[in-house]
From Swiss-Prot:
InterPro entries for the chain: Ribosomal_bL12, Ribosomal_bL12_C, Ribosomal_bL12_C/ClpS-like, Ribosomal_bL12_oligo, Ribosomal_bL12_oligo_N_sf
Annotated GO biological process: translation
Annotated signal peptide: none
Disulfide partners: none
Family recorded in the similarity comment: Belongs to the bacterial ribosomal protein bL12 family.
Molecular function, one GO term: structural constituent of ribosome
Protein name: Large ribosomal subunit protein bL12
Subunit structure as annotated in this protein's UniProt entry: Homodimer. Part of the ribosomal stalk of the 50S ribosomal subunit. Forms a multimeric L10(L12)X complex, where L10 forms an elongated spine to which 2 to 4 L12 dimers bind in a sequential fashion. Binds GTP-bound translation factors.
Gene Ontology CC terms, in alphabetical order: cytosolic large ribosomal subunit
HAMAP family with a match to the protein in the record: Ribosomal_bL12 (MF_00368)
Top-level taxon: Bacteria
Amino acid sequence: MAFDKDAIIASLKDATILDLADLVSAIEEEFNVSAAAPVAAAGAADGAAAAKSEFDVELTSAGTAKVKVIKAVREATGLGLKEAKDLVDNAPSVVKEGLSEDDANALKESLEATGASVTVK
């Protein structure tokens, strides 16, 4: 059985979007396939399996020694006094982003030593 590609392409050009959607559905049913792109599914699986390399340190609570926490935040971030105080007052807030795991854990330990509650995400 021979077919004329040009004739098929010409009839596809003349078809409406609804006709083309029906055609795709019919082809999926006839050949038991899906029109979904397999690349997208594989890409999502690769992203979930990849190890996390950047971490964010989030101050969840300043605790009772707020002044010590503000000083520690200033040292870690280089922020001014007002900015560091605002960050601590508005907890939960991100202290630093994009750190390596070791740096994030070191910052977490130094902030927790001042009495703050900290999470690494």
